[in-house]
Swiss-Prot record:
Gene from which this protein is expressed: trpD
Swiss-Prot/TrEMBL GO biological process terms: L-tryptophan biosynthetic process
GO molecular function: anthranilate phosphoribosyltransferase activity; magnesium ion binding
Pfam families membership: Glycos_trans_3N, Glycos_transf_3
PANTHER family in the cross-refs: ANTHRANILATE PHOSPHORIBOSYLTRANSFERASE
Residue positions binding Mg(2+) 1: 93, 226
Cofactor(s) required, per the database record: Mg(2+)
Residues that hold anthranilate 2 according to the record: 167
Name of the protein described by the UniProt record: Anthranilate phosphoribosyltransferase
EC number of this enzyme: 2.4.2.18
Organism per entry: Methanoculleus marisnigri (strain ATCC 35101 / DSM 1498 / JR1)
Length: 338
């Protein structure tokens, strides 16, 4: 099937959902060669992926994933980004996840090691003492104990190994950069999802709706795959099956502007120190952007009527020590070392 799909996509023809799902199933089952996968991904990138294609790819990846047994998704939130923005910031969405959890929002964060950055979410969590390699049958236990669980993507998507060589060798962004945040095996009902290009906010929000998400904000701000404090943020929000687009500015919520340079990170130990400082209540640009993103996650989780209310809950989560306590609980629940 993939050979026929390469020919169709190379001529500019969109794939049907069945065709797209079939190609991804071939890739996930090791039935396509690296050359075929690389050719397909490159042709698809040149044509441009449709919402229907991306949704079909995501469904096929989810079908090939290691299952996680949890109750119905409900208000569980994932704070995740595509990466690839090249900004080299500290792990903002990971910090926001602990703040949201401290405000009472169950968080199932899907992530990986650094690919386009020096420090991915798994890297910084390990530096903080979290054991990221918990088996699928313990995710529910960890979530109940800590209010937050981390799902290390390679442990749940082993079939991705078949695409690894092709992705490395072609060296360009492909649809797989989008699929990671769309394939959380724990079935989060709400997503705060950052993308590396503002043009992706609307289509990715539509994909999430197609995949059954209840709530989502797909965001890109000032060159970051986050809600930004350095400038306006483009948002596509999914709610009630409808997607609306708008621009927001941190100053609307009383959050001061700051430069991207003030948010620069480094390796795992450096980023862990920054994250710990934020969770311990340190003031400054790092806290400000975490409050903004955590406020959105809390809003998506149903604990606030809007981002402003979410930010108020986020401030309480930090100032009461609840966010830091969620980190402590996660370390204990995963058997890590503080």
């Amino acid at each position: 099937m993939i050979r026929e799909a390469i020919a169709r996509v190379s001529s500019g023809t969109d794939l049907t959902p069945a065709e797209a799902g079939g190609v991804m199933a071939e890739i996930m089952h090791g039935a396509a060669t690296p050359a075929q996968i690389g050719g397909f991904l490159t042709a698809l990138r040149m044509k441009g992926e449709t919402v229907a294609e991306i949704a079909a790819f995501a469904r096929a990846m989810r079908a090939a994933a290691v299952p996680v047994a949890l109750p119905a998704p409900g208000a569980r939130v994932d704070t995740c980004g595509t990466g690839g923005d090249g900004a080299g910031t500290f792990n903002i969405s990971t910090a926001a996840a602990f703040v949201a959890a401290g405000a009472g929002v169950p968080v199932v964060k899907h992530g990986n090691r650094g690919v386009s950055s020096r420090c991915g979410s798994a890297d910084v969590l390990e530096a903080l003492g979290v054991s990221v390699a918990i088996p699928p049958d313990r995710v529910g236990e960890v979530l109940a104990a800590a209010g937050i669980a981390f799902l290390f993507a390679p442990a749940y998507h082993p079939a991705m190994q078949y695409a690894r060589i092709a992705r490395q060798e072609i060296g360009i962004r492909t649809v797989f950069n989008l699929l990671g945040p769309l394939t959380n095996p724990a079935g989060a009902g709400a997503h705060l999802l950052g993308v590396y290009d503002p043009c992706l906010t609307l289509p990715v929000a539509r994909v999430l709706g197609d995949l059954g998400a209840e709530r989502a904000m797909v965001v890109h701000g000032a060159g970051l795959d986050e809600i930004a404090t350095a400038g306006p943020t483009t948002v596509a929000e999914l709610r009630g099956g409808e997607v609306t687009t708008y621009t927001l500015d941190c100053t609307e919520f009383g959050v001061p502007r700051s430069s991207v340079a003030a948010l620069r990170g480094g390796g795992p130990e450096e980023n862990a120190a920054t994250l710990l400082a934020v969770l311990a209540g340190e003031e400054g640009p790092a806290r400000d952007i975490v409050l903004l993103n955590a406020g959105a996650a809390i809003y998506l989780g149903g604990k606030a009527d809007g981002i402003a209310g979410g930010i108020a809950h986020a401030e309480a989560s930090l100032d009461s020590g609840a966010a830091l306590d969620r980190l402590r609980r996660l370390v204990e629940a995963t058997g890590g070392a503080a």
